[in-house]
A protein has these predicted regions:
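A beta-strand edge to alpha-helix "cap/lid" segment located at domain peripheries
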Residues: 62-155
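A structural signal for alpha-helical segments
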Residues: 5, 46-49, 103
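Low-complexity, compositionally biased segments
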Residues: 9, 25, 30-31, 46, ...
Length: 155
C-alpha cells in the first residue's frame, strides 16, 4: 500500500464531502458514501443508516437555496486499520446563514469518520460529529453591509 497516496485519496474524499454539501450537490455527495453508510449528526440526536436516508436528510435540512452553508475540515488525523479501512478525525469549522430568518449559526466540532476502500475508491462508511460549540447570531446586527450567494436569482 502506498500510504501517502491513500492518505491523499481520503483527504480528497472528505474535501469533496464538504464541497458537495455546500454546493447542494446531494447526488454527488451520495456517490462519496458506501451504500451501508451510517451517520450521527447533531451530537447523536440524528442517527441515520444507509446512503439514501443520509442524502435525503441532508437535502431536506440543508437544501433550501435561501440558506448558505460553509464547512471547513482541518487537521485530519487518519489511521489505517487495514489495507482497506481507515478511521479519521477532522476538526470542523462551519457556518450557516439564513438571511430571510436573520440568522447565522457558527460553530466547531470534531468529525469521526470511518472509510472503506471499494471498487470505486475510498468511500465514507460512517460519519458524524460532536460539537465543541455552536452560537446563533442575528445576521443583520453583525454589521453586514450586503449579502449575496450563488443561489440568489440573477439581477
Amino acid at each position: 500500500m502506498d500510504t501517502a497516496a491513500e492518505l491523499e485519496a481520503i483527504r480528497r474524499l472528505k474535501y469533496a464531502y464538504f464541497r458537495t454539501l455546500d454546493l447542494k450537490q446531494f447526488d454527488d455527495l451520495g456517490a462519496l458514501l458506501t451504500e451501508d453508510v451510517t451517520a450521527s449528526y447533531e451530537d447523536g440526536k440524528t442517527v441515520l443508516e444507509g446512503r439514501d436516508a443520509i442524502v435525503t436528510w441532508l437535502s431536506a435540512v440543508l437544501g433550501d437555496t435561501g440558506m448558505v452553508t460553509e464547512h471547513h475540515g482541518h487537521h485530519p488525523e487518519i489511521t489505517f486499520t487495514s489495507d482497506s479501512t481507515a478511521d479519521g478525525t477532522w476538526y470542523l469549522q462551519d457556518r450557516v446563514i439564513v438571511p430571510a430568518a436573520d440568522l447565522e449559526i457558527a460553530g466547531t466540532a470534531f468529525y469521526a469518520d470511518r472509510y472503506r476502500l471499494t471498487d470505486e475508491g475510498w468511500r465514507i462508511a460512517h460519519t458524524g460529529y460532536t460539537r465543541v460549540f455552536e452560537e446563533h447570531r442575528t445576521h443583520s446586527t453583525l454589521a453586514v453591509r450586503s449579502f449575496r450567494s450563488r443561489f440568489d436569482a440573477p439581477g
